[in-house]
Regions:
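Hydrophobic alpha-helical segments of integral membrane proteins
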Residues: 14-22, 70, 74-78, 255-262
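Extracytoplasmic/luminal low-complexity segments enriched in Pro/Gly and acidic/polar residues
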Residues: 236-242, 249-277
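Cytosolic-side transmembrane helix boundary signature
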Residues: 32-56
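Membrane-embedded alpha-helical segments of integral membrane proteins
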Residues: 11-41
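A structural signal for short, hydrophobic/glycine-enriched beta-strand patches
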Residues: 59, 64-252
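Structural signal for membrane-spanning alpha-helices in multi-pass inner-membrane proteins
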Residues: 40-43, 62, 66, 264
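A cross-taxon signal for low-complexity, glycine/charged-rich
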Residues: 3, 7-8
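Transmembrane helix-loop junctions in multipass membrane proteins, especially transporters and channels
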Residues: 48, 77-84, 268-273
Length: 277
């Protein structure tokens, strides 16, 4: 392997690990629980008063993040950034689906393809492949795990696409990417898009701004096809959550994406802080 390529691989791995660590601490549920535990621990020391305040504040903020509409309020701008794709534009040359919807831990153990809550990233491909029979189908996704790193998402996608009845010769699989940045760069290397070709990018609506920004930075212009909406729209700005877990999951998802946008812009992986159409 050339020295330059080796250096890029090492740098990419370091960024991947650092991003996972930052991602963990970007989630309010993790941060607030950690603060709460610190507060509880301090109550057994001479800083008991400060500990009670820290624990109490963390508990209140957990309630706000979990039960209030806060999660909807911060995910909505992400979801609304790119409008639904306009079919009047005509048939695309190809369709790209990003990983993140396939469970690489459960699937090999259970012997079937297990999907998570982002399943629309995959099911949309079945409909698009039928609607545009001449379009190439590309899936980009290796394994984004540090632990429990098993099969690649691409291998599971191949099985799922076969069950959809998509001809094997239409499909191209990118199985090395571990994050959104690598999705963009590795997919361009695989596809080698020609001038004037139009490609659809299928991913969760809240993930679309960062994904489009990465593909643009890689020199691969794409048309957004957002799926997997978590809100109904502005009406959900007033809708609280019935369970703490659901609200925290929404808040975590949105915060992880906002932090991702900021980090990607800071390190030059996108050219815009909040990419738009």
């Amino acid at each position: 392997m050339p020295a330059t390529s080796a250096g890029m691989t090492i740098a990419g791995t370091m960024f991947f690990i650092l991003a996972k660590i930052l991602g963990f601490f970007s989630m309010p549920s993790n941060v607030l629980m950690a603060l709460g535990l610190v507060g509880v621990a301090l109550t057994a020391s001479r800083f008991a008063r400060a500990g009670r305040r820290i624990a109490g504040t963390a508990l209140i903020l957990l309630g706000v993040a979990g039960w209030s509409p806060f999660g909807n309020a911060i995910i909505l701008p992400l979801e609304e950034r790119f409008p639904a794709w306009d079919a009047a534009r005509g048939a695309p040359a190809g369709i790209i689906s990003l990983g993140g919807a396939l469970d690489t831990v459960v699937s090999p153990v259970r012997g079937e393809v297990a999907l998570n809550e982002a399943a629309e990233r995959m099911t949309a491909i079945a409909e698009l492949a039928r609607r545009f029979p001449d379009a190439r189908i590309v899936f980009s996704g290796g394994s984004g795990r540090i632990i429990f790193d098993g099969v690649s998402e691409a291998s599971l996608a191949a099985r799922l696409f076969a069950s959809f009845g998509i001809a094997k010769e239409r499909i191209a699989l990118e199985d090395k990417s571990r994050d959104t940045d690598e999705n963009g760069r590795f997919t361009k290397e695989l596809v080698q898009p020609k001038m004037g070709e139009r490609w659809l990018l299928v991913t969760s609506a809240h993930h679309m701004p960062r994904a489009v920004g990465v593909f643009r930075a890689a020199g691969f212009p794409v048309e957004a096809f957002p799926v997997d909406y978590r809100t109904r729209g502005a009406i959900d700005l007033l809708r609280p959550f019935a369970t703490l877990g659901d609200g925290l999951r929404r808040t975590d998802t949105a915060m992880r994406e906002w932090v991702g946008l900021l980090i990607y812009r800071m390190v030059g992986r996108t050219d815009e802080l909040f990419p738009a159409p």
